[in-house]
Each structure stands twice: as structure tokens, then as C-alpha cells.
Amino acid sequence: MLFYKPVMRMAVRPLKSIRFQSSYTSITKLTNLTEFRNLIKQNDKLVIDFYATWCGPCKMMQPHLTKLIQAYPDVRFVKCDVDESPDIAKECEVTAMPTFVLGKDGQLIGKIIGANPTALEKGIKDL
């Protein structure tokens, strides 16, 4: 005869969703298309981080972005939540997150798709 004896009992709690929390000190959040268009015109060097709060790779890029912001003070960094501002994401043809759109002298000149810190830094150096 077999007897079942529980080895350990533990309460199971539902997972709480992890929200994107910015630790950036010099980053602006884009909220509308007019603001986006003005931002492009006003900045010599620009990086737009398209992200979603539920995107794991976006969260993984946060520490790398913080370092890049500190390393390149002459570059303007902004972020755009694709769920809150789908019109801006559509304007930049964003289809995956994270996507980083690079701008220079009032023009959008490049796009880096995916969590690739090396490619992002190379793109910033080339601005």
C-alpha cells in the first residue's frame, strides 16, 4: 500500500504583470503625432525607442539605454509606447518591439529592430 505524504506546502500567488518603468533621466515620452513631427525638425541627433509595457526584450534594453544616454549627451533620446501612440508607430512603420528609429538633421535615417545593444550603439556613433 502506498501512502502519499506531501513534502512541502506552499501558497501559489498569481503573477503580477511587470510594467515598464523608466529610470532614464533625460528622456522624453512622445504622446502625439504633432509632437513627434516637431521633435524630428528640432533635433540634430535623435533616437526614438518604440516599446511596449508587456515586451520582455524592451525591458532587457533599459539598462543599455541608460548607459547610452549617459555616454552620448549630444543625442536626444525619446521613447514611444506603441500601445498608447499607435499613430506615431504607424508613421515610422514599426512592426516589432523594440524598434529604435534614428534621426539626424531633421530626417529619419535608420532603424534598428530588436534588442541589439551593439547595433544600437553603432547606429548612434554613426549619427
UniProtKB/Swiss-Prot annotation:
Boundaries of every Thioredoxin domain copy: 22-127
SS bond partners: C55-C58
Annotated site location: Contributes to redox potential value: G56, P57
Annotated keywords: Disulfide bond, Electron transport, Mitochondrion, Redox-active center, Transit peptide, Transport
Active-site residues (renumbered): C55 (nucleophile), C58 (nucleophile)
Main location: mitochondrion
Transit peptide endpoints, chain numbering: 1-21
Site (Deprotonates C-terminal active site Cys): D49
TM regions (residue ranges): none
GO terms, molecular function: disulfide oxidoreductase activity
Gene Ontology biological-process annotations: cellular response to oxidative stress
Family: Belongs to the thioredoxin family.
Note: Yeast has two cytoplasmic thioredoxins, TRX1 and TRX2, and one mitochondrial, TRX3. Present with 1010 molecules/cell in log phase SD medium.
Protein name in UniProt: Thioredoxin-3, mitochondrial
Organism the protein comes from: Saccharomyces cerevisiae (strain ATCC 204508 / S288c) (Baker's yeast)
Name of the coding gene: TRX3
